[in-house]
Amino acid sequence: MWGRDYELKYISYPKSVAIIGASKTEGKVGYAIMKNLKDFNGKIYPINPKYDEIFGIKCYKSVLDVEDDIDLAVIVVPNIVVPKVLEECGKKGVKGAVIITAGFSEVGNYELENKIKEIAKRYNIRIIGPNCLGIMNTHINLNATFAKVFPPKGGVSIISQSGAVLNAILDIAPLLNIGFSKVVSIGNKADIQESDLLEYFLDDEDTKIVVLYIEGLKDKRFLKVAKKLSKKKPIIALKSGRTEVGKKAAKSHTGSLAGEDVIYEAAFKEAGIIRAYTFEELVDLIHLFSTQPTISSNEIGIITNAGGFGVLAADSCVDYNMKLSNFEKSTIEKLKNILPPTANISNPLDIIGDATPERYKKVIEVLAEDSNVKGLLVILTPQEMTKPLEVAKSIIEVKNSHKEFKNKPLITSFVGGVSVKGAKSYLRKNGIPAYITPENGVKALSHLYKYSLMKVKEDYDEYLENIKEEFIKITEENKEIIKELLSNPNEYTAKKLLSIYGLPVPKGYLAKNEDEALEYCKKLGKCVMKIVSPQIIHKTEAGGVIINPKNPKEAFKKLIENAKEYAKRMGIDNLIIEGVLVEEFIEKDMMEIIIGAKRDDIFGSVVMVGLGGVFVEVLKDVSFGISPITRDFAHEMLRELKSYKVLEGVRGRPKRDINFIVDTLIKIGVFMDIHKEIKELDLNPVFVFNEKEGGCIGDARIIK
């Protein structure tokens, strides 16, 4: 964080570690860390003026007394002493520090935390923490934590804001035979952020999978770095606090719908991060990605000894965008020779309730060799003739003896409790995920498929880049008028501003009196009249819209009266009425949607699309993306909508102009990226015409 030329190797691969606050007293953190470092491949230097030695290792009064170079300092002294020892580390030339000590910003002690940040910056020391569990690197036997468990060596690197969550994962890992590479508890993140570590893991050969436990992000670089890393290595994240923080303060439709969690959801989706929603799912995903290959096709085979669960799994294929493979002819012939005559050879493949371990084994072997089957789900239910543990052993045997499973995931669902407990444990320990339900098995395969799609997704979009260039030029050429329009944002000025950037809006005028209203209505022919007031957000509720008025003068007066009555009813003091917007009436076959945007402190411009008009906050059929938005991602956003089929045309209804929506989403994202003074933007409704006919922004609201 202090500079862009830094390296984290002195923290992750130190050759020497000083433990400042090392202790001989059992139960103290300094004792636990000394004990955990006993097998470290490098040199250890205990620092504590009370002792001459600890565990038979010479103890020093200060890091300044150590003759050798020190790469990493682990600090476990009281919080008020931390600045002093960190200063000494700086003078000694220590490259990195892990500050275990608590009592900083997490308890409101920002002054003390700022002090250590200033010292670290002055001496160019990289800091992890404060208020953290510590760090591990299994590849050099580095356990600079006070955790009880040191996990097996492997390819999973984990970054966590919670020491407790980290401890729980480490405790579970041996049961699942999950191997770890780097383990980092980042605590308060005074210096090193998630993005710093993600950037480091990009080229770390020992890291194959990255796991995140996030409570909140501070660093705006996170999205960019995560997007780059996820192309090479899976990133799995669990985000706690899934509540819509700040929703009450939101002033627009977009603001009220774009709570904290939906923004994180959009960011993870755009960065290619695989999101876990529960701790259990996080552990399952770690096990899945550390044991199974990804698949480039969504065609899977399902084996079951119970027809009902096969049907449930097939239903889940629809839910998770997976397909049932068509077995090759040679596969069908082989299966006929293996299965009883009563077996129906189709997918899902019901191998009958009396299926033996040998039958399971032979069927799995056949489907392993079928090139149409890209992934395999094996379901077992405990029946009188079933031997779950023996079946589990046969599955492991097939997996280990068939090279096809290097590129073909093999997932199991042993449905039951007591009868299958041992078998599931055996499968997991031997690298086969075992789920309690078939639905979760299908979902697991879908994760492997979605990740493979994300890896090959093209991030560069020439159209997007052209829009960026065009909008920058427009902004420069229209500086003064844009500044004037943004000085008093209302529907009229918002639409004028959007039209400068080529976004389609109805022709309209702002009437200040009855005579102007009449004049403008005559100009436009069939028209719509709308009240313009910064205090009236929902015009329909206020009686602030009149369509095709017979008497524009009377309509003008009526809109003013309605606005005043609404203000009185809602307790609005000092009502400001800026006039009445008179616009052309759009007479086309159309569908209403909403497009909006919100400024987020971490992720920047968040763009929203959904079913529009008055129903947006009732149905909440919306999707979010982080700008800049590519055409592919804009299409993904639309496909997430439950109402997407309506856009495509159903039951005789015409197909709408989806390309117009995609184009508008891209442009609104770029518009928001340029105008950082805008906090929220609502385009509701946006009229979408029939295919290739475009659309038009019906209403616009800008909040600065």
Swiss-Prot record:
This is Acetate--CoA ligase [ADP-forming]. Catalyzes the formation of acetate and ATP from acetyl-CoA by using ADP and phosphate. Can also use butyryl-CoA, but not phenylacetyl-CoA. Cannot catalyze the reverse reaction. SMART domains: CoA_binding. It comes from Methanocaldococcus jannaschii (strain ATCC 43067 / DSM 2661 / JAL-1 / JCM 10045 / NBRC 100440). The lineage of its organism: Archaea, Methanobacteriati, Methanobacteriota, Methanomada group, Methanococci. Keywords: ATP-binding, Ligase, Nucleotide-binding. Homodimer. It is an enzyme of class 6 (ligase). In the N-terminal section; belongs to the acetate CoA ligase alpha subunit family. The keyword Heme does not apply. It catalyses: acetate + ATP + CoA = acetyl-CoA + ADP + phosphate. Its EC number is 6.2.1.13. GO terms for molecular function: acetate-CoA ligase (ADP-forming) activity; ATP binding.
